[in-house]
A protein has these predicted regions:
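Histidine-centered active-site/metal-ligand motif
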Residues: 2, 50, 91, 140, ...
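Catalytic core of non-heme Fe(II) oxygenases with the double-stranded beta-helix
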Residues: 19, 43-122, 126-127
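A structural signal for short, well-ordered beta-strand segments
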Residues: 34-36, 70-72, 159-163
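Non-heme Fe(II)-dependent double-stranded beta-helix
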Residues: 1-60
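Short, catalytically relevant binding-site loops at active-site mouths
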Residues: 38, 76, 91-93, 144-145, ...
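Non-heme Fe(II)/2-oxoglutarate
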Residues: 97-101, 133-138, 142-168
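Active-site rim elements
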Residues: 5-10, 117-127, 146-148
Length: 168
């Protein structure tokens, strides 16, 4: 999208999007992926528990977990419209064992089994960031996350910039 849309191109290069990741990694970053994640009212899909870096490592051959996601809410995100759920601190464990699921969602995903999720949640709990349109969150590529289906009457559309250290 950032290659075809001037507004998305400006967003992808905006200092507020890029500088936190540059500061964290201590070097310039590049755009690994630019995604628009639309969870339509009443029928937005579920995304199973996973780590983005697991997919990037297995499918894209990204050598190290020096990557972050910047998520911008284009709609209000509330407890009803399928918000992201994070397991705090799970990124500190590095890449976890995962199984390749090619059928549940429209995108093949390396998913984490339920027993592992139970143990992680017992240790770190669960959080589901919510906020008005325009809110921004950053999360590490190894942070375990998922989202439920959107059965509410409200869309939940977000833009994701996946930024990676240039040395990676």
């Amino acid at each position: 999208a950032h290659l075809y849309s001037k507004p998305f191109a400006k967003l992808a290069r905006h200092p507020r999007m890029v500088e936190p990741t540059t500061q964290l990694f201590g070097e310039d970053v590049y755009m690994h992926q630019f995604k628009i994640n639309g969870k339509a009212a009443f029928d937005g899909d579920v995304w199973q528990w996973h780590q983005d870096y697991g997919t990037w490592r297995n499918d894209d051959q990204m050598p190290e977990a020096r990557a972050m996601n910047v998520a911008i809410f284009l709609d209000e995100v509330n407890e009803f419209n399928g918000p992201l759920m994070f397991i705090p601190g799970s990124h500190k464990l590095g890449v976890l064992d995962a199984e390749h699921d090619v059928s549940t969602t429209s995108y093949p995903l390396w998913t984490i089994n339920h027993d592992t999720i139970r143990r992680l949640v017992e240790r770190g709990g669960l959080v589901a960031p919510k906020g008005p349109a325009g809110s921004m969150i950053l999360f590490h590529g190894c942070l375990v996350h998922a989202s439920t289906a959107n059965l509410s009457p409200w869309n939940r559309v977000s833009v994701y910039l996946s930024l990676c250290a240039v040395s990676n």
